[in-house]
Amino acid sequence: MALPPEKATELKQIIHEQLTRMDVHGKIREVLAESLREEFQTESQQLSEEDLMQALRQRGIVDEVMKELHFMEDRHTRELTSTPKPATHYIDKETRSLRKTNVDPTRRYLHLQVLNGKAFLEHLQESDPLPGQACSTFTLCLHFRNQRFRSKPVPCACEPDFQDGFLLEVHKDSLGDGSKMADATTMLSICDPVQLVLLKTDTSGETTLVSSHFLEWRSILGTEKGVTSLAVELLGVGSECKVSVGVLNVKLELYPPLNKTLSQEVINTQLTLERQKTAEKERLFLVYAKQWWREYLQIRPSHNSRLVKIFAQDENWVNRPVCSYIRPLRAGRLLDTPRQAARFVNVLGYERAPTVGGGGKPEQWCTLLAFLCRNKGDCEDHCNLLCCLLLGFGLDAYVCVGTKGRGQAHTWVMTCGADGAITFWESLTGHRYVHKPINPDDPPMVEQPKPLYPYKTIGCVFSHKRFLANSQPLDAVEVCVFDLHDESRWKPMSEEAIKSVCSPGSLASLPPFPPLCSSLLDAATESNEIELQLRLLVLEHRKDLDLTTVWDDQLSYLLSPALASYEIERTTGISAGNEEFQDSIRRAVPDGHTFKGFPIHFVHRNARRAFATCLRSPFCDEIISCRGDQMRLAVRVRVYTYPEAACAVWIMFACKYRCVL
């Protein structure tokens, strides 16, 4: 029976790993050297393949290999019924199969090929990974005019083996007629760069942002054959933004080639004009912002201590107006409600911007592509994305900059209802709070609303169109009135000034906003995999305690409704299904028996890490290490997938046993 290509590749990989483990190649070299010395002394004799095989058989090496490479007869049957496992050595050395794509013959395409990497000196001492050995990998993510791509992972090395090609449609969406192909002049007016984001994934699955680069591709418009090669130097991020991390050799090719090319002088002139126009707009906005700030300080000198953030640095330490980080973002079919959008942002990982040495909170607001590809970011990254999504759903949303407990700087999102209702959204938890201001002039006997939110002070709010600074006598959130049209309470910036540097297409230097991508994770497969790993970890843990383990599959299944109810509550704020869950548990636990359950939530899929966290809870440790008569254990895992690689992982451990006291 012929194996499918993916199974044949996996089989080759397993055989290769087994041969490597047994060092068959080394044994063959030893036999070859010995045979040449002892049996083939004369120059006239030549060592044939048959002679070498005979020598290998005589030494028992062939028999040893065949004994090791044994395959069970029912393996094919098991593969049809169980979840297919990937090859243990996941780095595919075979040539990648070409994937068919729909190419519009009336459109122009840019084929970007990443040929290889050079001078990644941080990995100079790293050797090539052995087959089956886990290793850190590089992944390259691209975005160009609403198109996103991701390379296959390659092992981290001084010269990483990047070999990937990406077909980019040049005049996507609005530019160009449907029946007219973009010419060189039209393409020269497209100032969108190709954004490259390089990620590093370590052996535990943690991702690190290595570099974020904007590639200017329009030099190809001046080449005769529509082909050019570039050496793209990648710089680090944050405090290392001036340090080179490596070089990518890139080949650009236009399909179909241009009938008429442009001179390099014309291209350089266009790029120079764009830079000059951008610099002038940025200069004028800076002049205006300084004047606006002086006016704000004249209202009340104490305003100097309020958190009024006009500019923020991105991962490349480029200063940009905060309004440029916001733009209405529609999620298409990926998210259905604003609350689901808040849940999606909540399950993206939280990680403070890295810093070298001590000091205050580091400044780094990531571009949207870098945040989405890394799948984690700081509080500001979460807030910016949530605000973009809420604007996309038609809400009047703003990012708030202020402080929470102990004076710690913090950001959150605010929406203003048509009826004037103010709602705060915490991007890191998905919680929502209704704001009802306290009137400090009311007499003491008047009952005041008690705020439930953790926010203490607020300095400013902003969106993609507006920037307003808090000019009320007190900046405490609980007494603030959020009537943003009242200029006596909120000092606005000129919307025209903001538009000149923050609206789409206003500046060539503005990073374009990428679309969201659907999840590539299979929820059922991921749930099964994590659950199996947790069962093994529990088994090992109890074995160390000299305890036997008996699993109750039916009880495990009955935990599913509880996990579903928890996720629904996190998404909608409504609790449902708890009565049915409790009734089923009562029926499953006999009289005289005790039931204990422990649910916990994660935003990663690392089973060992999750298990270690669970054991730190005394209540969970009591369940996992439980002793008793007729003791049965249960565990249920449910993975809920969201756009990108985001997921909510719910785990519930439970046990039932008969009380003997």
Swiss-Prot record:
Keywords: Cytoplasm, Cytoskeleton. PANTHER family: CENTROSOMAL PROTEIN OF 76 KDA. SUPFAM superfamilies: Cysteine proteinases. GO terms for biological process: regulation of centriole replication. The gene is cep76. InterPro entries: CEP76, CEP76-C2, CEP76_C, CEP76_N, CEPT76/DRC7_peptidase-like_dom, Papain-like_cys_pep_sf. It comes from Xenopus laevis (African clawed frog). This is Centrosomal protein of 76 kDa. It is found in: Cytoplasm, Cytoskeleton, Microtubule organizing center, Centrosome; Cytoplasm, Cytoskeleton, Microtubule organizing center, Centrosome, Centriole. It holds the Pfam family CEP76_C. Belongs to the CEP76 family. The keyword Cytoplasm applies. GO terms for cellular component: centriole; centrosome; cytoplasm. Centrosomal protein involved in regulation of centriole duplication. Required to limit centriole duplication to once per cell cycle by preventing centriole reduplication.
